[in-house]
Amino acid sequence: MLPKNYDPNEIEPKWQKYWLEEKIYKYRLDENKPSYAIDTPPPFTSGTLHLGHVLSHTWIDIIARYKRMRGYNVLFPQGFDNHGLPTELKVEKEFGITKDQPEEFLKKCVEWTWQAIEAMRKQFIRIGYSADWDLEYHTMDDWYKAAVQRSLLEFYKKGLIYREEHPVYWCPKCRTSLAKAEVGYVEEEGYLYYIKLPLADGSGYIPIATTRPELMPACVAVFVHPDDERYKHLVGKKVKLPIFEREVPILADEDVDPNFGTGAVYNCTYGDEQDIVWQKRYNLPVIIVINEDGTMNENAGPYAGLKIEEARKKIAEDLEKMGLLYKKEKIKHRVLRHTERSSCMAPIELLPKKQWFIKVKDLIDEIIKVAKEINWYPEDMFLRLKDWAESMDWDWVISRQRVFGTPFPFWVCKNGHIIPAREEDLPVDPRFDKPPVDKCPVCGAEIEPVTDVLDCWVDSSITPLIITKWHEAIKGDEEAKKWFEHNFPTALRPQGTDIIRTWAFYTILRTYVLTGKKPWKDIVINGMVAGPDGRKMSKSYGNVVSPEEVIPKYGADALRLWTALAPPGEDHPFKWETVDYNYRFLQKVWNIYRFAERHIKDFDYEKYRDVELEPLDKWILSRLHRIIKFATEELERYRFNLITRELITFIWHEVADDYIEMIKYRLYGEDEESKLKAKVALYELLYNVMLLLAPFVPHITEEIYHAIFKEKIGEKSVHLLSWPEYREDRIDEEAEKIGELARKIVSEMRKYKNSHGLPLNAKLKHVAIYALDSYERLKLIERDIAGTMNIERLEIVKGEPHLEERIVEVKPNYKNIGPKYGKLVPRIVQYLRENAESIVREIKEKGKAEFEVEGKKVELTKEDITVRKEVFSEGEKVETSVVDDVVIVFF
């Protein structure tokens, strides 16, 4: 029996424990069922879930639960992305250990990560997440690293991995190279410096504009637009760099924007991506002036050792003293920063480094072609990936100068030859393990270990292969082959908008190269979570809300409904009032089933399911089955927001406020046949509503199932039942019109009782309902209206009522007539009382009424009086209400 009060903190942990103990969500390969494998995002092991995780993973959970109910063999694992700089920083801070002790450092990284995993797994379970935890994976596991390394060996065999010096995105704060996907432009305030560069022949100056005067020692050319009349005559000449006394050429190129600054810019190696393009296009020299730590090197001359910002300020001061800096303009411009990590956000430098690359640019067209074969939800998210792919300037930098990461399965010799690991030795760590050979097999040179580790996206970009056991299948394992063939390509990749250009793009690339296939059939994209104020959640804004603040107060199910209300692909603000509303809705659901329990728990629905029902029963079941159809269509498209709103509205208003209230008199009445029909409809309605709600709010529906339905049905969990069956024979448009009419009439009668201070169960002695077109429908529900509203005498009359409106009182507006007529006011009041109808008629016809009081002329307009009218029917005073073509007369 359901307890009196809904307490999510009581019921939710109970069912979470039950699901784990009973292995309700255990995956068993069943080749007789259609596969549905979900390539779930492995969150970075920070130790805590934020609301973004709750939103994305609740969406995934809704899909998994729904697909299980549809009869799919749902493969639903969950992994954790372990490697990365944040863990290294945490270990350095908490344990006081440095990367100079790599073996000990790695042990501490693993130790800290396990603690984070345990905490996050508990949080996942607390939101009702139904993954099969026996399939949990971690990117730091040896078998996972072996799979990653095996994938790289395959890439190497295909000639897709190489090592060379190339300008890379470098974070001076994190001291590592980054992929393009890890950096982004941030608009901020800065300065544009206008500098006169002397021509080498002494004939004058060319003015350039730059935001980075500190890069002057790295200047290798000055560029102008070929059609710029101001500078055409200077192309081919040289400038002499002030301070550094070095000559560089003036060149013309169409990439120059003549409207920016002075229309002339200097090319430094490297200030931005355009500098790289020009340097390669014109085979210009490379001069590097910035160290890995963000200080100026010896090539900066007198500015060596200064930090970048210090050098910028000092060189600007020196140029100003020389009379060459003639303007400093405050501007808004875009600065390239380490945007992937909000705790860093340091400006990025472009430094040439020996790095490892995966060839991507040559595969762009193929990647886009494969991406097109995938169903994107929403569709326009495909364009984000396409635009990103087409904008790539160079290949994917996969090496990172860190410690805690998957090692490269390579050694190198001093001549640059690559020595791959043997497949049977994987996983290997060249930092600690011996190479497969003593000397380079190509040139005989000494072999050195590759000490870099892999970009984290190299780990996570093979998750669809990991969960489908590709790494075991390619070794010849027969069981793994079956698993792989049944589940790959996976059915779904769920992820956020923020990682389309990283996780989605790299996964398509990697799985296509390794298998020749797309990684998934569908991809569904959720937006980001904003704070209650609509801005991005940030500690600096003070608008961060954690799941731990919400769940103890409202429970996981109420929070899950908030996630389900998020529109596909759009950002979704967290709103306390929304969660509160959801909680009150769940209380309403609880009360519905508490009421119904005594009527349907022991009822034999199967015996009577096909009896001829009454009009209101047909109405509510027609509405139910329309919603079953709509819910199925929406969930197949991975759209939750519209069906969630529809379900809440339907259950709260049509089911609770209307239908149940309109059948109570039948359930408690003496007409056994009518009572039985009401129970048939109520059972079918509430059983299916429970199933519709189950993927969204799994805890409350499990409690309801065990209290009311389990004894008869026998299945261990509501989540092992089948999705509601849509019955076309239940759709009845005429019944829906009748039901809607009943709702409106009952609503008007409730308003009448409320306006008279009457309780809703108060008896009404006499009500007449007049109708023309709706007469026949009203006759069918006459007993329902009378029973619901407790009407002693209800008449349904075809036609229009004979109503007479009478003026019963006319009162003066004292604020108006008081100042005008003073002592005459009492006599005016008496006159109005005696001549009410004629006064009102005269004002209506002439706009004013004129009469004399004590010999003085009085003039009144409609602003001077208040008229009270009453309606009479057959001489008896009545009140009326109108609904469509129906007039309700209350006697």
Curated annotation (Swiss-Prot):
Reactions accelerated catalytically: tRNA(Val) + L-valine + ATP = L-valyl-tRNA(Val) + AMP + diphosphate
Cellular compartments annotated: Cytoplasm
CDD domains from the UniProt entry: Anticodon_Ia_Val (cd07962), ValRS_core (cd00817)
Name by which UniProt lists this protein: Valine--tRNA ligase
Motif ('KMSKS' region): 536-540
Biological role stated in the UniProt entry: Catalyzes the attachment of valine to tRNA(Val). As ValRS can inadvertently accommodate and process structurally similar amino acids such as threonine, to avoid such errors, it has a 'posttransfer' editing activity that hydrolyzes mischarged Thr-tRNA(Val) in a tRNA-dependent manner.
GO CC, one annotated term: cytosol
Binding locations of ATP: 539
Gene: valS
Motif 'HIGH' region, residue range(s) on this chain: 43-53
Family designation: Belongs to the class-I aminoacyl-tRNA synthetase family. ValS type 2 subfamily.
